[in-house]
């Protein structure tokens, strides 16, 4: 395990870590090969680039992000991180990847409703060994949720919870940020504020971005658009 952890630490700081999809087809996705779809093709992705993931409901946007994060395994084909097949990663290796390499904002947010907003944020930063109370305050103020930090999450609006989930992801180390329809309950102004902060932090870290959306591109100018 010690050798594997050391290997992952070295892997996570490579300047151009790549993901390759090789003929991937998730179970439950219609078996219909389309010209512009990412399914059943060879696709090379760089973790320091920006991608817009588009598709209608049920076409696999969330599934694609879940495959990258290693939480969905029922698919045919292969996914390589670096030169390694992610199916062969053990649970400890995935835990390290999710702490240091890939961060995600889930569509259902996955906040703990009985805890305060600050407690939800602090749990994640403690797990990532990066206590950042001052940064929490600063970023929460930028996203307009500083006044809600001491409130239980279940009392917040879904839009406020979305901003907290975005903040939680930004506070952890990452090489790429996976966003699953993160602005669905935000007005255009708050969506723009969130996206500006996301792009700013990604640029500071030379990190990549995968933004899944039904249709709206939120003004993002991606390096590549991916269709599912």
Regions from the language model: what does each represent?
Residues 166:
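Hydrophobic anchor residue at the start of the ABC signature
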Residues 152-160:
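Conserved ABC ATPase signature
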Residues 133-148:
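Conserved ABC ATPase "signature" region
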Residues 69:
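Helix-to-loop junction immediately C-terminal to a conserved catalytic motif
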Residues 86-103:
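ABC ATPase NBD coupling module
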Residues 108, 114-127:
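Q-loop/switch helix immediately C-terminal to the Walker
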